[in-house]
Design a protein with these regions (language model features):
Chain A
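Membrane-embedded helix boundary and interhelical linker motif in transport proteins
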Residues: 5, 27-73, 77
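Membrane-interfacial amphipathic/re-entrant helices at transmembrane-helix boundaries
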Residues: 1-16, 45, 54-59, 85-91, ...
Length: 286, 614
C-alpha cells in the first residue's frame, strides 16, 4: 500500500507536468522536448530564491514565473520563427533537442554538478489507508488537484480556454473566425510554462535532492503519460499521468527499483505502435 | 611530440575519424536521403560494438579470471566478429520497423526511437549477466592480435588504414544507392511520403531496407571502434550521442554523403580533439557541459542560417536536351506565366509517352463502390456512396464544399480507409489493398493540395513516377548504372517529351518546390500520367491553372479517354464539366445526389438547389 502512496505523489507531479506539455503540443503543435530542461531550470530558480532565506512556498512562485517567461521566450525567439519557415515538423523537434541540451548543460555549467536541496521542513508524517505521506507530499497532491481543477475551468468555461481549444483543433479556421491565434499561442506558452515551472519545483521538492541532470529521464514519463491519454488531450494527460505514476512506483515495489521506468517505456512504445492517438482519442486527432 | 607518439596520435585520429564518418554516413542515408529521423541511431552502433566484443572474446567464465559476465564469448577470429557486428546492426533494425512503417507521423516515430535508445541503455546497464552491466565489457581482443603486436605503431597505423578503406567503400556504396532510381524514390519519400505512396512506392519496404542498411553501417562502425579501444560500456552510448551525430550531419550537410563525412570530422572528432588540447579550467564537469551547450547551439544556428549544411545536397541535372540557361521559376508570377510561358499543350499526343498497349473502349465498369462510408470521430463525412466508373469515360464529380468529394477520392485510392463499404477495381475487391499496391495496379490519384517533391527537380519528379523501373529497388540500385542506366535514359527522355508538350522544358532541372502554383498542378498531372494509370483520379487538377490551358488539358484528357484511359475528376469549374465530363456525379452532404450529363443535372431541381445556384 505504501507504494500506492509513492505512486500517487509521483502521479501528482507528473500530472502537472504532462498537462502543460500536452497543451503546448495541442495548441502550438510543438513537441517541445526541452520541457524537462525548463522544469529543472525553474526548480533551480526556486532554489536560489529559497537560499536567500525566503520560504520555499513563496520561492515556488519564482520558479513558476521562470517557467512561464522562459517558455514564452523559447516560443518567441526560437519555435515560432522556425515554424514560420514552413519546414518539416521534425525540424522543430530537432531544434527542441538542441534547446534541451543548451538548457540542461548550460545550467550544469553554471551551477556545477553537485546536488542541492531546498531548505524546508517535510512536515508531519500522515498515516492512513496503509500509506505514509509527509505533509509536503500532501500539499503537492493538493496543489495538483487545484491545478487540474483550474485547468478544467480554464478550458471549459473561459473564453481564453475555448479559444485555445479552437486553435488546437484548427488553427487557420480559428484565425479566420476571429480568434487572435498568435495571442492565444503566446498565452498557451505562458500558462503551460507556468505549469512546467511548478512541476519542476514540486519535482525537486519530492526528490529531496537534485542537480542539473536529475530529470534527464523525465521526458520519457511525460511522453508516456501524454501518449497514453492521447497527444494534445489535457484530460487524457491527467489520466495518463495517474496511470504512469502509479504503475512505475508499484512496479518498483514489486519487481525492482532499477527497472521502475521500464513500464513507462513499454507503455509508450506500445501506444506508438498500436494506438498513437491515445486510449480515448480517434484517428482524426493526428 | 616524438615521431612515434605522433604516429600513435595519427592512428587514433584515423580510427576515430573513420568510426565517426561511418556512423554519419549511416545516419545520412537514413535521415538525409530517406527522411527517417532515427533518434535511436546509437543503439545500432552499440549493438555492433557489443556483438564484435562478445564474438571475439573467449567465454566469460573461463577468461580473464571471470571478472566480467556476458553472453556468447565465442572467441572467433577476425574478421568474423566484424561481420557479425554488421549483421546484428542490421537485424536489430527490424523490430523498429513498426515505428517507421507507414502509419506513424515522423516526429512520433522519432520520439519512439529516442525512447528505445534510453530504454535499451537502461536495461543493459542494470542487467549485468547480459553484457556486464554498467561496468561494460573490457579487454576486448584486438583483431589478429595473436599474429601481430597491437601495441606496435605499424599495427595501429594499419588499423587506421583499414578503417579508412571501409569508410571509403561505404561511401561509394551509399552513393551508388543514392544516385540510382531507387535513391530518387527514397528522396521522394523523404519530401512527401503520402504522395510517394500514392505513386506506388512501398514506404514500409523502403524504410525497412534503409533502416537495416543504416543499422549495418552503424554496427560496423561500432565493431571498428571496439576493436581499437578494447572496451565498451553503457556510458559510451547515451541517447545524446545520437544528437551529436545529428549535429554532425546537419552541419556538414544532410543528404550529401560528403557533407556527412565533413560533419563527422568537424563535430564528433573535432570536439574531441579540441578539448584534448584545451588547458584545464573550471570544474571537471565544466568542459563537457560546455561542449553539449555548443552542440545544441550549433544545431539551432545551422538549422536557421544554413539548413542545408556546409555542403548542401546537390541538384541532379537530368535533362539530356542541350542545356539552356537554367531558369529560376518565379513563384509569385502566377498569372503572367500561365498566359505566356506555359500553356502550349498543343499538338502533343499524351498517349505517345505511355507504354501501355492501346485499349478498345468497351465502357465496362472499371471502378465501383458499394455503400462506401467514412466518419471521423463520430462525424459522418461520406455515407453510403455507391458509384460505378465506366472504362474510357471522363467522369466528373461535383458538389459543394464539404460534400465529401476529396474523401471519396482518397478512399478510392486507398489514402484513407473507409469506415464501411467496399471498393472494387476491375472486379476485384480492393477495400483492404494498400494504396501503393493500387497505384501499382494502375489506380493513380493526384492531390488537391500541392504535392510536388520539393527537393527533387521537375524532371526527377516526373521520372520517379514511372513504374517498373529496374533500378527502383534496393537490389537493382546495387547493380549499378550499367544495369539500369540505359533504361533510365529512355525514361528521362519520355519525361522530357511530356514536359515539352506542356511547355515547361525550361524548368526541367529546377527544383519543383520553386515553381508557381499553376505550374505545380501541371507537374502533378504529368507525373500522374507517367505513372501509367488505367484509372486516373484527379482532385481539382485545374485549380490555379489558366483557363485556356485548363481547356487544352481537358481536351487531352478526353483524347486519353478515347484511347482507353478512365478518368475521374473532381472540379469546381462547371464550364469544364459542361465541356468535357460525361457522366457527372453530384455529391452533397456525403451522399450521391444525382448522376447524369450536365444537361440532365441542370434540369434536376434538387441538384440546382444544392449546388448549381448555391
Amino acid at each position: 500500500m505504501s507504494s500506492f502512496g509513492f505512486g500517487l505523489i509521483t502521479a501528482a507531479v507528473l500530472a502537472i507536468a504532462t498537462v502543460g506539455f500536452t497543451m503546448q503540443f495541442a495548441v502550438t503543435n510543438v513537441l517541445n522536448l526541452a520541457y524537462g530542461s525548463v522544469m529543472i531550470n525553474s526548480a533551480y530558480v526556486t532554489y536560489w530564491v529559497n537560499q536567500h532565506g525566503i520560504s520555499v512556498w513563496l520561492a515556488l512562485f519564482a520558479g513558476v514565473f521562470c517557467g512561464a517567461v522562459v517558455s514564452w521566450c523559447l516560443n518567441r525567439v526560437i519555435y515560432t520563427p522556425f515554424q514560420r519557415r514552413n519546414l518539416a515538423p521534425i525540424t522543430v523537434v530537432i531544434v527542441s533537442l538542441g534547446v534541451d541540451l543548451m538548457g540542461t548543460f548550460g545550467l550544469q555549467a553554471i551551477v556545477g554538478g553537485s546536488y542541492v536541496t531546498y531548505k524546508m521542513s517535510q512536515g508531519h508524517e500522515f498515516h492512513f489507508l496503509g500509506m505514509f505521506l509527509s505533509g509536503v507530499q500532501l500539499i503537492i497532491i493538493g496543489i495538483c488537484a487545484g491545478v487540474l481543477i483550474l485547468i478544467h475551468w480554464l478550458l471549459k468555461y473561459t473564453r481564453l480556454g475555448k479559444a485555445m481549444r479552437a486553435t488546437s483543433a484548427n488553427r487557420n479556421l480559428a484565425r479566420n473566425s476571429g480568434v487572435k491565434t498568435q495571442f492565444i499561442i503566446s498565452m498557451t506558452w505562458i500558462i503551460s510554462g507556468a505549469l512546467c515551472g511548478l512541476a519542476g519545483t514540486v519535482f525537486a521538492m519530492n526528490s529531496g535532492v537534485f542537480e542539473a541532470t536529475s530529470n534527464e529521464l523525465y521526458i520519457v514519463l511525460l511522453l508516456a503519460a501524454m501518449f497514453l491519454g492521447g497527444p494534445g488531450e489535457p484530460y487524457g494527460a491527467m489520466f495518463g499521468a495517474l496511470a504512469i505514476g502509479l504503475s512505475t512506483e508499484i512496479s518498483a515495489a514489486y519487481i525492482t527499483a532499477d527497472y521502475k521506468e521500464v513500464i513507462a517505456f513499454l507503455v509508450l512504445l506500445g501506444m506508438l505502435a498500436f494506438r498513437p492517438y491515445g486510449l480515448f482519442g480517434s484517428e482524426k486527432t493526428l | 611530440m616524438s615521431l612515434t607518439s605522433f604516429g600513435f596520435y595519427m592512428s587514433t585520429i584515423l580510427v576515430y575519424g573513420a568510426v565517426d564518418a561511418l556512423a554519419c554516413l549511416g545516419l545520412s542515408i537514413e535521415f538525409g536521403v530517406a527522411g527517417i529521423t532515427n533518434f535511436g541511431f546509437i543503439i545500432f552502433q552499440a549493438a555492433g560494438a557489443y556483438t564484435a566484443a562478445i564474438l571475439s572474446m573467449p567465454n566469460a567464465a573461463t577468461s580473464n579470471g571471470g571478472f566480467q559476465e556476458f553472453v556468447l564469448g565465442w572467441n572467433l577470429p577476425w574478421p568474423l566478429p566484424w561481420i557479425g557486428a554488421t549483421l546484428v546492426g542490421g537485424l536489430i533494425a527490424l523490430p523498429f520497423v513498426f515505428l517507421v512503417g507507414k502509419r506513424l507521423r515522423g516526429d512520433f516515430a522519432a520520439v519512439g526511437l529516442l525512447v528505445s535508445a534510453v530504454l535499451l541503455n537502461l536495461l543493459v546497464k542494470n542487467y549485468v549477466p547480459f553484457l556486464n552491466g554498467d561496468a561494460g565489457i573490457s579487454l576486448v581482443p584486438a583483431p589478429l592480435q595473436n599474429l601481430f603486436n597491437p601495441q606496435s605503431i605499424g599495427y595501429q597505423l594499419a588499423y587506421g588504414g583499414v578503417a579508412i578503406i571501409l569508410t571509403v567503400l561505404v561511401y561509394f556504396l551509399l552513393r551508388r544507392i543514392t544516385e540510382s532510381p531507387y535513391g530518387r524514390s527514397l528522396r521522394a519519400m523523404r519530401d512527401n511520403d503520402v504522395v510517394a505512396d500514392s505513386l506506388g512506392k512501398n514506404l514500409r519496404g523502403q524504410r525497412t531496407s534503409i533502416l537495416v542498411l543504416g543499422g549495418m553501417i552503424a554496427g560496423l562502425s561500432g565493431a571498428v571502434l571496439v576493436g581499437f579501444i578494447s572496451l565498451w560500456a553503457p556510458g559510451a552510448w547515451g541517447y545524446a550521442e545520437t544528437i551529436v551525430l545529428f549535429a554532425a550531419i546537419i552541419i556538414g550537410g544532410a543528404g550529401n554523403h560528403k557533407g556527412a563525412i565533413l560533419g563527422a570530422i568537424l563535430v564528433p572528432l573535432g570536439f574531441e580533439e579540441i578539448t584534448r588540447f584545451l588547458p584545464p579550467f573550471g570544474s571537471p564537469s565544466l568542459v563537457p557541459a560546455l561542449e553539449w551547450v555548443a552542440i545544441g547551439l550549433l544545431i539551432i544556428l545551422f538549422l536557421w542560417f544554413r539548413p542545408n549544411g556546409i555542403i548542401p545536397e546537390k541538384r541532379r541535372i537530368l535533362s539530356t536536351i542541350v542545356h539552356r540557361a537554367p531558369v529560376t521559376p518565379d513563384a509569385d508570377d502566377d498569372d503572367a506565366e500561365s498566359a505566356s510561358n506555359i500553356g502550349s499543350v498543343n499538338d502533343f499526343d499524351f498517349r505517345s509517352v505511355l507504354t501501355t498497349a492501346p485499349v478498345v473502349n468497351d465502357h465496362r465498369v472499371m471502378l465501383s463502390t458499394q455503400g462506401l462510408s467514412k466518419s471521423f470521430s463520430g462525424v459522418t463525412v461520406v455515407s453510403g456512396v455507391s458509384i460505378s466508373i465506366q472504362q474510357g469515360r471522363l467522369t466528373g464529380m461535383i458538389g459543394p464544399n464539404g460534400a465529401g468529394k476529396s474523401t471519396v477520392m482518397a478512399m478510392l485510392a486507398g489514402t484513407l480507409s473507409p469506415t464501411s463499404g467496399q471498393i472494387f477495381f476491375e472486379g476485384q475487391d480492393v477495400t483492404h489493398v494498400a494504396s501503393y499496391k493500387r497505384a501499382q495496379a494502375g489506380l493513380v490519384r493526384t492531390f488537391q493540395l500541392a504535392s510536388e517533391f520539393k527537393k527533387l527537380t521537375v524532371l526527377e519528379n516526373l521520372v520517379c513516377a514511372i513504374p517498373h523501373q529496374s533500378g527502383d529497388s534496393f537490389t537493382g540500385s546495387l547493380r549499378g548504372r550499367r544495369y539500369w542506366g540505359s533504361e533510365d535514359t529512355s525514361n528521362i527522355e519520355r519525361a522530357e517529351e511530356i514536359l515539352e508538350g506542356f511547355g515547361l522544358s525550361q524548368y526541367a532541372d529546377a527544383y519543383a518546390g520553386g515553381l508557381s502554383g499553376g505550374q505545380r498542378r501541371l507537374v502533378e498531372i504529368m507525373r500522374a500520367l507517367l505513372a501509367e494509370p488505367t484509372v486516373l483520379l484527379l482532385d481539382e487538377p485545374m485549380a490555379g491553372v489558366h483557363r485556356n490551358l485548363a481547356r487544352k488539358i481537358g481536351n487531352h484528357l478526353v483524347k486519353l479517354c478515347k484511347a482507353g484511359m478512365t478518368v475521374v475528376m473532381v472540379e469546381h469549374e462547371l464550364s469544364i464539366m459542361d465541356e468535357f465530363c460525361d457522366p457527372v456525379i453530384v455529391l452533397a452532404e456525403g451522399k450521391v445526389l444525382a448522376e447524369g450529363t450536365m444537361a440532365e443535372l441542370r434540369a434536376n431541381s434538387e441538384v440546382v438547389e444544392a449546388y448549381l445556384v448555391g
